[in-house]
C-alpha cells in the first residue's frame, strides 16, 4: 500500500517512515492552549509530535523512534526554546509487536527527565471507546502545511471529523486493527509530514496518535488519515507506567 510516515527531515530517513505534519489547512493554535503538546527532536530539529500524559511520560508513535535526543514541552514556538522547556529522553518504550505502520501497534511511550515546573498533561480515555461517525475532533502539530513544505515554528491546529471504519477500510483496501480514521477524506483538512505522533483530541481527551497518510502527499481528498486508537492499548500503557514506578 502507499501509506507513508515521513519524518520532518525527509532526506535523512528511510522512505517508509511517516512523520506527519498536522495542519493541512489549519491555523495557529491559540496562545496558552494545548501546552501538553511535545516536539520530539533530533540534533537537526523537530522530527515528530507527541503529548504529555503524566509528569514524566510522553506518548507518541512507534515509527518516530528516529535519532531522538530531546523533547520540548510547554511552548507553541519551537524556534527559540527556553532551556526550562527541554527534557531529555531517559528511555523509550516502543510497543513490542510494532513492525511498521502498515501492521499497526504504532504507539510508544518516552520516559523523560523531570523538571521542577509542572506542565499541562492531557487525559487518555478511561476505557475502550467507539467514536461515532462525524465526531468533531482536532489534531495539532508543527508539521508541513502543504506537500513539499517544511516544518513550522508555531503550533498549528485543524479540526477533523471521524470517518466510518468501513469506509476507511474500503478507501485504503484494508487498514491495521485498532485504528481511528479522521480527516483527509472528502476534505482538505488533515495532517501532513511532521505531525506524526501527535494526538487526535476529542472532547478534551487524547483518543488517537497520528500514524500514517498517503505517500508523501497531503493534498489528497481520497484517503483518510489514520491514527492509532489509544483506548485499545490502555492495559499496555498501564503496565509500562506501573513497571517504571516500581523500579524507581
Please give the residue ranges for each predicted region.
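Conserved H-D interstitial segment of serine endopeptidase catalytic domains
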Residues: 40, 58-100, 117, 158, ...
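Conserved active-site neighborhood of the chymotrypsin/trypsin-like protease fold
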Residues: 58-61, 103-127, 154-157
Amino acid at each position: 500500500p502507499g501509506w507513508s510516515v515521513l519524518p520532518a527531515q525527509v532526506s535523512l530517513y528511510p522512505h517508509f517512515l511517516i512523520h506527519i505534519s498536522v495542519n493541512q489547512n489549519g491555523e495557529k493554535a491559540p496562545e496558552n492552549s494545548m501546552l501538553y503538546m511535545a516536539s520530539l527532536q533530533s540534533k537537526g530539529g523537530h522530527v515528530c509530535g507527541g503529548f504529555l500524559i503524566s509528569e514524566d511520560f510522553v506518548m507518541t508513535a512507534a515509527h518516530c523512534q528516529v535519532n531522538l535526543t530531546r523533547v520540548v514541552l510547554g511552548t507553541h514556538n519551537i524556534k527559540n526554546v527556553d532551556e526550562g522547556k527541554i527534557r531529555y529522553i531517559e528511555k523509550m518504550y516502543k510497543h513490542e509487536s510494532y513492525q511498521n505502520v502498515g501492521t499497526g501497534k504504532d504507539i510508544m511511550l518516552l520516559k523523560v527527565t523531570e523538571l521542577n515546573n509542572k506542565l499541562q498533561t492531557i487525559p487518555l480515555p478511561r476505557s475502550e471507546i467507539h467514536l461515532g461517525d462525524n465526531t468533531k475532533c482536532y489534531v495539532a502539530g508543527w508539521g508541513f502545511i502543504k506537500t513539499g513544505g517544511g516544518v513550522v515554528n508555531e503550533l498549528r491546529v485543524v479540526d477533523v471529523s471521524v470517518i466510518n471504519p468501513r469506509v476507511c477500510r474500503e478507501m485504503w483496501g484494508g487498514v491495521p486493527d485498532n485504528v481511528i480514521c479522521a480527516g483527509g477524506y472528502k476534505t482538505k483538512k488533515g495532517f501532513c509530514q511532521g505531525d506524526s505522533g501527535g494526538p487526535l483530541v476529542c472532547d478534551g481527551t487524547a483518543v488517537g496518535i497520528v500514524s500514517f497518510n498517503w505517500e508523501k502527499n497531503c493534498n489528497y481528498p481520497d484517503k483518510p488519515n489514520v491514527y492509532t486508537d489509544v483506548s485499545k492499548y490502555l492495559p499496555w500503557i498501564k503496565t509500562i507506567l506501573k513497571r517504571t514506578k516500581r523500579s524507581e
